Amino acid sequence: MKKLIFTLMAAAMTASSTAQSVDTESLSAYDQNVPIGWATIGEGVTGSNDENPVTVETREALIAALAGTTPKTIYVKGTILFTGLVSINGAQNKTVYGLPGAVLANPDHSTIKAESGILQLKNCKNIILRNLTFKGAGAYDMDGSDNLELQASTYIWVDHCDFQDGVDGNLDCNNGSDNICISWCRFHYLIAPWSGGSGGSNDHRYTNLWGGGDKNAAKDEGKLRTTFANCWWDEGCKERMPRIRFGQVHLLNCLYSSSVANYCVGGGYRSNAYIEKCAFTSNAAKKYPWKNYATSGTFNDYNYTITSCLGATDKQTRYGSIDYFIPSEKYSYESYDAALVQSVVSNSSNGAGATLKFTDPTAIQESASVADIVKVEYFSLDGSRLTMPRKGIAMQVVTKADGTKLTRKITLSK
């Protein structure tokens, strides 16, 4: 007769929302804990709905967990090392939570392009990434890869992530990606830039490129619609915060404090930016909150609006015939005064960056519920549902009559 041996690596979890595992008591009063803006239009972003939890501690386990379209909640634990860009193609319905201290890192400087970058989402849909720290090897201009790349992906929410020292960029987006929310993320550079790259720049701390080329209209026209909210471009950021082509991009309650900024927001061909209630606090950021990067000839359409910001004068300018992008005409949202942005966004406890607190799904934890058990399900460690328990390690999910779910890591033996 088989015997279930519980290893007591359990956590009480439910599957009713995209933020079930977050300690909401520790959040900023201004943190809505949900995707906002462009990510709410149409289908919206739900990720895994916190279904099918799995904890990963290796690159191989992370890649396997991200694959496919089955909803899966992936908890990243510890530091996972990369030796080059990993491309995830066609994934859907995933939520990735970085447990406190979780890092995705490619720390070794290389002059070989294939050895740069960390993670690429390509042709993906309905993906949530939260509380992850991405660490690159330092900026180096060789047309390499980024810490995180969004390629032809839709309904993406990146929240409370910390991006450091991307080789080509920290977080870039292009090739028709759309309906994106980047919230409470921090971008900075801690490593001195590497010189001598084939691209010609000895300081390529260019953090976010939104739209890769003026001639990519077939893919990017009408796409790249993104809301950046409560993000922080911190020390070391030189340019591209972000630099935009084609997209209607809303920058809301963001903080610009880099002392080495050549410019902050860059406007390229057919860009349409709305910069609202942001704070430009460093002298460099105040000097050039916006720069027109529209090219000559036929590639010179652009729009931008700066309104109610700290350290930047209200202004609305365009070249060409594109209508101004006004976010309130597209979606509803909440905001706060620009005078509060620096204290809110730079708060080390709950501001931008990987500051979320979570319940570790592998920690020992007892269920407080005394309700009757109504269902018991089993899942493999990669999150796949099992029709019946089998010998080895698996996850058992117990559902009680009051809706409580208790997840246990178990070992089944004879």
Residue ranges and their predicted role:
Residues L81-D220:
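Right-handed parallel beta-helix
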Residues R243-D360:
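Extracellular beta-rich repeat passengers
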Residues R390-A394:
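A glycine-anchored, Pro-Gly-centered beta-turn/N-cap motif
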Residues K2-A12, S17-K72, T83, S308-P361:
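Extracellular "leader-to-stem" segments immediately downstream of a signal peptide or signal-anchor
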Residues I74, V96-G98, I127-R130, I156-D159, ...:
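All-beta strand scaffolds that present successive hydrophobic residues in beta-strands
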Residues D360-R385:
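Residue-level detector of functionally pivotal "anchor" positions at catalytic/ligand-binding pockets or at interdomain
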Residues I88, V103, L190-A192, S201-E276:
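Long, polar low-complexity repeats
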Residues M395-K414:
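C-terminal tail/sorting-segment detector
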